[in-house]
């Protein structure tokens, strides 16, 4: 059979017969012949002829399997799954601990290969795709300086790479990161407090505010609570406060967690379907930031003793 695709951009597409059953193919002008090379439970690896970009992608996948030592990793996975099927938690923990160095080494080897491959393909769409899919999302864009440096770096990609959708996707994300970077005015947050009254972040303008994004079900979030209490005590009477922000769906669990953890500061429960993760560029919780009296973000991703040490740099 034949597919005719009107695609003006050279880009990676998913080719399959139904969602989750298929694999990736680089779309480019010409007559591409596609047949399955390997079919696994996790999807299909397509063999594509008549395409320079797909040859580059195929060669990268083969090299990646070698440097990562995928055969060894597959055998370790099999051992872990066998122990899991037996519900042998002790054996699962042992395998996980002893396997970790191999996975870390594999990730380091893959990262090195990715960077080398990107450097060798700065002029073509494959290079920008690989950069976007493997490296871009793992970079730190918490400051305006980092965002500016990233925009400058992307200018190094050639004209053909600049015409791909990946540049537009990254620019859109950088614009979003700029809105929640250190030095930017913290976006407004609105919701209800523990008594059901309206509350918003700007109510605390004029104070230093630790904003703690958390949920009652998040174990790691609640482990930060003792450190937050220390911060509240350390800066008592110094124009400082804490605002907990949660998107808990069950108000009773949210209230119970606040009471149980002795989180004796202001709390805000977000309205349903509030996309706070996008607004604040949050990749996971806990996500704790410091906002200054002027409403600007002073610090991000604070943990443990940083909840006292970082504000101390600003509060005198």
Protein language model annotation of sequence segments:
Residues 101, 138-146:
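Short coil/turn connectors between adjacent alpha-helices in alpha-solenoid helical repeat scaffolds
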Residues 1-109:
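A non-transmembrane, solvent-exposed segment enriched in polar/low-complexity residues
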Residues 222-261, 271-278, 309:
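Structural microenvironment flanking redox-active thiols in thiol-disulfide oxidoreductases
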Residues 262-263, 270-315:
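Thiol/disulfide oxidoreductase modules built on the thioredoxin-like
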Residues 120-137, 168:
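Amphipathic alpha-helical repeat scaffolds of TPR domains
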Residues 208-209, 286:
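Alpha/beta-hydrolase fold active-site loops
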Residues 205-206, 213-230:
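Conserved redox-active cysteine motifs that mediate thiol-disulfide chemistry
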């Amino acid at each position: 059979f034949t597919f005719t695709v009107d695609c003006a951009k050279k880009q990676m597409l998913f080719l399959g017969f139904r969602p989750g059953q298929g694999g990736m193919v680089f779309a480019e002008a010409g007559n591409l012949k596609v047949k399955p090379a390997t079919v696994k439970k996790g999807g299909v690896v397509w063999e594509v002829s008549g395409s320079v970009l797909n040859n580059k992608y195929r060669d990268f996948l083969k090299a990646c399997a070698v440097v990562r030592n995928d055969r060894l990793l597959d055998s370790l996975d099999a051992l872990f799954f066998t122990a899991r099927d037996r519900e042998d938690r002790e054996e699962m923990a042992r395998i996980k601990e002893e396997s970790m160095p191999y996975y870390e080494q594999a990730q380091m080897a893959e990262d090195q290969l990715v960077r080398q491959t990107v450097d060798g393909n700065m002029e073509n769409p494959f290079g920008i795709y690989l950069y976007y899919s493997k490296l871009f999302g793992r970079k730190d864009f918490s400051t305006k300086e980092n965002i500016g440096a990233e925009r400058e770096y992307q200018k190094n990609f050639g004209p053909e790479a600049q015409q791909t959708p990946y540049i537009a996707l990254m620019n859109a994300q950088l614009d979003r990161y700029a809105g929640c970077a250190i030095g930017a005015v913290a976006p407004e947050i609105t919701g209800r407090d523990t008594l059901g009254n309206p509350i918003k972040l700007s109510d605390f303008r004029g104070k230093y505010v630790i904003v703690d994004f958390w949920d009652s079900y998040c174990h790691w979030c609640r482990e930060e609570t003792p450190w937050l209490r220390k911060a509240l005590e350390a800066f008592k009477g110094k124009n400082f406060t804490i605002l907990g922000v949660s998107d808990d769906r069950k108000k009773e669990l949210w209230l119970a967690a606040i009471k149980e953890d002795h989180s004796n500061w202001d709390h805000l429960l977000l309205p349903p379907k509030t996309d706070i993760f996008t607004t604040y560029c949050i990749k996971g919780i806990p996500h704790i930031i410091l906002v200054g009296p002027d409403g600007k973000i002073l610090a991000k991703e604070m943990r443990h003793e940083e909840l006292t040490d970082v504000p101390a740099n600003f509060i005198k």
